[in-house]
């Protein structure tokens, strides 16, 4: 029998995809992008630090890093955890000098009607763990006496008093402090209960009052994170000693990865593994999907951020996929909670039909407004507040200025995919669902047989059946937005709206994903036109000729020729007369 040769395992650092415990990351020799230089900046900042970023952006690992750095119980592990990092060579005065208390409000399962019970249960669990870990430092019987207190507010106050008595300092971390806020945003009927919790004698307000009362004494530092500033504003007068650093330029790069950090990671793995693509080639694939977040207006034009979770997802799958580009570029868990998206859609639909912010972004490719640092829940329907909420959720990002206002765009294809997917909900009434029409087969024939008419006829039929009278009033904006949303569902293409090139603007360019579908044969550039229901056939013909001339110019641009690669480019003119497609023709 022939001897089976075992391939020698290549050593490489683990990819910390999905890991949120800093100690595990370091002890298991994972690749860690060094964010410890920010420890110095945090220590020089206000002792009560608020920081907002989109979900699944690396916040939890950053908190874990800080906890391990400041934990008085981890003194003996300082060298093993931080010795090879920046802060290991540049330690700060406060290292390993705090008792760490970590609360995660996402772990509170109770709703607003019994939020006190849920908060009490979570805090009691964390407070008991705290007392056990630091029993050798706390006064005798602290744990037993703490458990005799009636609720979380009383227990927190008691622990702060005991630490003050012993000359100890607590570093309090609160992760997802605004988790329960999603209920009020997603379900309007909860607004009254939310206000009761966050105003006046509300329990959550009382909890933050207790934190405020311990400030400057036993509660040495507080670090609060979440995804929305809404609750922060409603709690402001109860906790008015904190500083919101979410939009500060010095902390723009604290979570997420810069392109240089992504390149360094790829270069490392390419040096120890048989990569089939260069770093530049991988960046070309990743950048449109994961990059382009800017969290500070002062940083625009200098540094954009990649979603770190998505980068790790891509690298992990690229390696597991035998060094081929993964077909699935969007991690399932990255999708924003469905209820939250429904909330955004609900609020957006409450605007006048000509003032829909999401529609504006889809139609023009951008929107403008003023970025608000915080705002109360009851004023979420103010346009600037709603736009700012989209920003904090990661649905739009800063893209410079326009006519004196901040310009916002969809940051990348991961977000665009989510926005267009859920935007379809705004075009459906009573939660109707699209019939499939064997949509998968239509998409395959579009990509491999050049059969565009059945595909665009399918879109036109869906548009006609699911559009309300209010949608029809939007005219061209509605047709354009609906078509974009539908084409975004096709896995073979990345639809780009109003492609900016040297020949002008094309309405939609279906950029073929050749790196994933190497045998794809067809690509499309589409000029969408809209005319009113009463438009004559003669006027329609004139509109077609006008669109044909435009699309020929677009198709000859360098950017289109580069993107289509080996596929056949189809130049299409699609004209809607009202809500019905009147023409779908290829221009030779």
Q: What are these model-predicted stretches?
A:
Residues 166-197:
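Conserved P-loop NTPase "ATPase switch" module shared by AAA+ and STAND
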Residues 172-175, 205-206, 220-227:
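Structural recognition of the conserved hydrophobic beta-strand(s) that form the central parallel beta-sheet
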Residues 231-238, 245-316:
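Amphipathic alpha-helical segments of the small helical/lid subdomains adjacent to P-loop NTPase cores
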